[in-house]
UniProtKB/Swiss-Prot annotation:
Record family assignment: Belongs to the RimP family.
A Pfam family per the record: RimP_N
Identification of the protein by name: Ribosome maturation factor RimP
Domain of life: Bacteria
Gene this chain is encoded by: rimP
GO cellular component terms given for this protein: cytosol
Chief localisation class: cytoplasm
Species of origin: Helicobacter pylori (strain G27)
Subcellular localization, as worded in the UniProt entry: Cytoplasm
Role of this protein: Required for maturation of 30S ribosomal subunits.
Keyword annotations of the record: Cytoplasm, Ribosome biogenesis
Length: 146
């Protein structure tokens, strides 16, 4: 269902100058919550941006009626520290410092340099590039340095 929602709202969000990072539908305390997270290629995602996007996509979602039950729409920034789960997440996080855990239990910190549909390239501290297929990644999360 979230894939259909993503397909419906992605073009609208891009027409406003922002990028759709993720869509998730969760249930918390018996309440359905549709979470839409954004990236602003020109800077931070402000509260005004979240409100603007929410006001535009809310009626669109109501008309499409993808979600049968009542739900709350939450629009937010993709966040400073987040887990990268899809090739799209990797592509939208290029240049960021990440912590990588591999399925073989190896782990390292690096800068995400490139990503495609099959693998991601990481620049290690010694500036060497390590290419890893997604199937070999256990967990990758962005790191925010204060």
């Amino acid at each position: 269902m979230t894939k259909k929602i993503e397909e419906k709202i992605e073009g609208v969000i891009e027409s406003l100058g922002y990028l759709l990072y993720d869509v998730s539908l969760v249930k918390e305390n018996e309440q359905h919550i549709l979470r839409v997270s954004l990236k602003n290629p020109n800077g931070a995602v402000s509260l005004d941006i979240c409100q603007q996007v929410s006001e535009i996509i809310s009626p669109l979602l109501d008309v499409c009626d993808f979600i049968q039950d009542a739900y709350i729409l939450e629009v937010s920034s993709m966040g400073l520290e987040r887990t990268l789960k899809t090739p799209k997440h990797f592509k939208l996080s290029l240049g960021e410092k990440v912590e990588v855990k591999l399925t073989n239990k190896e782990s390292f910190q690096a800068v995400l340099k490139d990503a495609n549909d099959l693998s991601a390239d990481f620049e290690l501290e010694d500036h060497a590039i390590k290419s890893v297929e997604y199937k070999d990644l256990k967990k990758v999360k962005t790191l925010f340095e204060w």
